[in-house]
C-alpha cells in the first residue's frame, strides 16, 4: 500500500479511513489489525484518530515508518501461516489483498476466528480489469489483455483473484452478519464531468501509471516469457489508453464489511 494510494482512498471515502463503524470519528475502538499494511500509513492515521485503540500492522516485508504513535506497532508476518495472536481484535482492516491470498475462504474464517464477538472486518478490493458503462473501452484493449495475463499468472502462482461480487457471500459463509457492500469508481484519468470523480481520476491515473511498469515487467517476463522489449512496447500502449479521455473506463472499488455476532458459534482452529 503506497502513500499515494492511501490518499486516493481518503478522497474516495470522504476523508474516512474505511466504512465499517470503527472508522467513525467518535467510535471507541479496542484492538485493530491492518493486514498487508505496506508503508503503515493507514495504521499511523488510525492511531492518531483513535488514541484509545491498539493497532497492529502486519506485512511480509518491513517498510514500516520509523516514527509512529505510541498505540501503533508493526510486525513482519505471513498471514498465510496459522495466526497466533495472543488476543483477539475488534476490527480487522484488509485492503487490496486480491491476488495475494491463497484461499479466501480460509482467510475470511481466520478473520472471523480472530475477532471478538461484535467485532468488524472490512475488505476493500477492486478487480484488476477496468470497465466502462458506455462501451468506450474496446474489447481488444491492451490494458484488458495485460490485466488478463497478470491474473492468469497470479492464479498459476497459487494466488487466485476472487471476483469482487463474491465477497459478500464469502463473509456470510464465514459467519459474519450485518454485511454491507459499498461501490465506488476509480476513473482511469480525468474524463468524468463530475468534479469529485475528475479529481479521483487524476489520482487514480497517477496511482496506476506509477506502478504499472514494474508490475507488468516482473509478471510478463517471468510467467509468460516476454522479452523486456516486448513489455516496453506493451506498456507504451497501455499508458496511451490510460491517458485517452475518450475511453470512459474505471475500476469499480468495493468496500465490504461485516460483523461477528455477539453470540458467535464455536470457532474452528486456525
Q: Where do the PLM segments sit?
A:
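Conserved alpha-helix/loop element of class I SAM-dependent methyltransferases that forms part
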Residues: 1-31, 41, 45
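Conserved catalytic/acceptor-binding region of the Class I
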Residues: 120-213
Amino acid at each position: 500500500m503506497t502513500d499515494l494510494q492511501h490518499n486516493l482512498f481518503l478522497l474516495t471515502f470522504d476523508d474516512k479511513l474505511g466504512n465499517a463503524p470503527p472508522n467513525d470519528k467518535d467510535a471507541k475502538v479496542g484492538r485493530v489489525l491492518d493486514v498487508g499494511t505496506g508503508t503503515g500509513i493507514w495504521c499511523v492515521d488510525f492511531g492518531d484518530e483513535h488514541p484509545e485503540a491498539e493497532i497492529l500492522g502486519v506485512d511480509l516485508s518491513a517498510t514500516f515508518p520509523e516514527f509512529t504513535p505510541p498505540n501503533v506497532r508493526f510486525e513482519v508476518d505471513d498471514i498465510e501461516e496459522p495466526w497466533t495472536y495472543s488476543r483477539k481484535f475488534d476490527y480487522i482492516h484488509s485492503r487490496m489483498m486480491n491476488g495475494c491470498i491463497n484461499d479466501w475462504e480460509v482467510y475470511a474464517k481466520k478473520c472471523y476466528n480472530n475477532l471478538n464477538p461484535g467485532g468488524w472486518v472490512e475488505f476493500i478490493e477492486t478487480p484488476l480489469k477496468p470497465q466502462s458503462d458506455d462501451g468506450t473501452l474496446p474489447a481488444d484493449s491492451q490494458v484488458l489483455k495485460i490485466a488478463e495475463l497478470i491474473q492468469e499468472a497470479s492464479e498459476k502462482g497459487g494466488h487466485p483473484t476472487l471476483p469482487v461480487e463474491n465477497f459478500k457471500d464469502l463473509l456470510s459463509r464465514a459467519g459474519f452478519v450485518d454485511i454491507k457492500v459499498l461501490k465506488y469508481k476509480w476513473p482511469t484519468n480525468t474524463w468524468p464531468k463530475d468534479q469529485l470523480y475528475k479529481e479521483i481520476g487524476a489520482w487514480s491515473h497517477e496511482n496506476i501509471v506509477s506502478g504499472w511498469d514494474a508490475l507488468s515487467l516482473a509478471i510478463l517476463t517471468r510467467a509468460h516469457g516476454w522479452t523486456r522489449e516486448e513489455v516496453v512496447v506493451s506498456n507504451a500502449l497501455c499508458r496511451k489508453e490510460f491517458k485517452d479521455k475518450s475511453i470512459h473506463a474505471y475500476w469499480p472499488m468495493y468496500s465490504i464489511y461485516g460483523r461477528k455476532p455477539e453470540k458467535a458459534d464455536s470457532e474452528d482452529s486456525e
